[in-house]
């Protein structure tokens, strides 16, 4: 994969913040700007995790809340070259902020600028 390719790993969680993470990742995929890897697979498939260390391009790890599950799981694989973002860093409050296209697009624009 080319180094300018964006690969997203997102923790979709069970709240509005996780929903933001998932929607952002899927919109990036749908637009052809990124590919997405399954977060859970990193925990259960060590071969997949090893193979993912090379050739993912720019890796964006997108968490939905301050627990930062995605970041922790990726760190456990030994992958260290990634950009970590949290939806709560964009003025989104867990359990409060409704999912809106405006906020989703704001996160996408931030990722595009990285």
Protein language model annotation of sequence segments:
Residues 1-114:
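Iron-sulfur-associated redox domains of electron-transfer enzymes in respiratory
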């Amino acid at each position: 994969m080319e180094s300018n390719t964006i690969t997203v790993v997102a923790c979709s969680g069970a709240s509005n913040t996780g929903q933001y993470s998932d929607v952002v990742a899927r919109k990036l995929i749908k637009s052809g700007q990124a590919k997405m890897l399954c977060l859970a697979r990193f925990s259960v498939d060590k071969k997949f995790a090893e193979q993912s260390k090379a050739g993912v391009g720019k890796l964006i790890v997108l968490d939905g809340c301050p627990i930062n599950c995605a970041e922790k799981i990726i760190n456990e694989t030994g992958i260290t070259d990634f950009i970590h973002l949290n939806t709560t860093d964009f003025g989104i409050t867990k359990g409060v902020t409704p999912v809106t296209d405006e906020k989703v697009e704001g996160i996408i624009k931030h990722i595009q600028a990285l």
